[in-house]
C-alpha cells in the first residue's frame, strides 16, 4: 500500500502526506551524512516550494544542487521500482543525483557513469576504475541469487560501498538502493538511515571492509 500511496500523493503534488515526509527525511539525512549544511527546515522549503527561506544564513550552492538531485533520484527510484536492479538503473540514479551539480561537472567527474579516477574511503583503497564494472556485475549476480532478507541487503550495501563505483555520491546512491529494495519486497520493511546513527553506520561499514579484504 505504501508504494501506491507514494504514487498517488506525488501525482497530486501533496506536500502533507507520507510521500513528502519520506522525500524530505531521506534527502536531509542522506545528504547530512555526507556533510551537507542544510537544515531540515531548508530541506522542506526546497522540496515544498523550490526556494530557501528569505532570512537564511549563507549556504553552499552544492548542498542545494545535491538536495534537488536527491529529490529527483527518489522519483526515478519510484518510477522504476518494478524493474530489476541493474548496473544501468544504478548509473541512472547517480545521474539524477549529480547531473545538476556544478562542482562535480567542473571537476570533470563522470556523471551517471563509473569513476574514471581512483578514490578512497579514508585510508581504505576502493576498487580501481578498471575493475569496477566486473565487481559491480559480480555483486549484482550474487544479490539476485539471494533470498531477500535484511542480512543480504546489508551485505550488498557494504560490498557496494567498498567498491565505491562512482567518483562521488556512492553513499547516497547506496542508501537509495537500500530504501528501494526494502520498499519493493514484502519480506522487508522500508527504512531510512538517520544522520543521528551516522557513527554506528560508518563503523559497521568499516568493520565489514576490515574483515572482508
Predicted regions and their residues:
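FIC/Doc superfamily catalytic core
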Residues: 1-213
Amino acid at each position: 500500500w505504501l508504494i501506491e500511496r507514494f504514487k498517488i500523493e506525488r501525482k497530486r503534488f501533496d506536500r502533507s502526506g507520507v510521500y513528502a515526509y519520506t522525500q524530505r527525511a531521506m534527502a536531509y539525512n542522506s545528504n547530512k551524512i555526507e556533510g551537507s549544511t542544510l537544515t531540515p527546515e531548508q530541506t522542506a522549503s526546497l522540496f515544498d516550494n523550490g526556494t530557501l527561506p528569505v532570512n537564511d544564513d549563507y549556504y553552499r550552492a552544492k548542498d542545494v544542487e545535491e538536495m534537488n538531485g536527491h529529490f529527483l533520484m527518489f522519483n526515478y527510484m519510484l518510477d522504476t521500482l518494478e524493474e530489476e536492479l541493474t548496473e544501468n538503473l544504478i548509473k541512472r540514479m547517480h545521474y539524477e543525483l549529480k547531473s545538476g551539480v556544478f562542482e562535480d561537472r567542473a571537476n570533470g567527474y563522470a556523471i551517471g557513469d563509473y569513476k574514471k579516477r581512483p578514490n578512497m574511503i579514508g585510508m581504505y583503497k576502493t576498487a580501481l576504475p578498471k575493475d569496477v564494472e566486473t565487481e559491480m556485475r559480480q555483486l549484482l549476480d550474487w544479490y539476485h541469487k539471494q533470498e531477500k532478507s535484511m542480512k543480504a541487503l546489508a551485505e550488498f550495501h557494504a560490498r557496494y560501498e567498498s567498491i565505491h563505483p562512482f567518483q562521488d555520491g556512492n553513499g547516497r546512491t547506496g542508501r537509495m538502493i537500500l530504501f528501494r529494495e526494502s520498499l519493493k519486497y514484502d519480506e522487508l520493511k522500508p527504512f531510512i538511515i538517520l544522520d543521528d546513527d551516522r557513527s554506528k553506520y560508518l563503523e559497521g561499514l568499516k568493520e565489514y571492509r576490515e574483515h572482508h579484504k
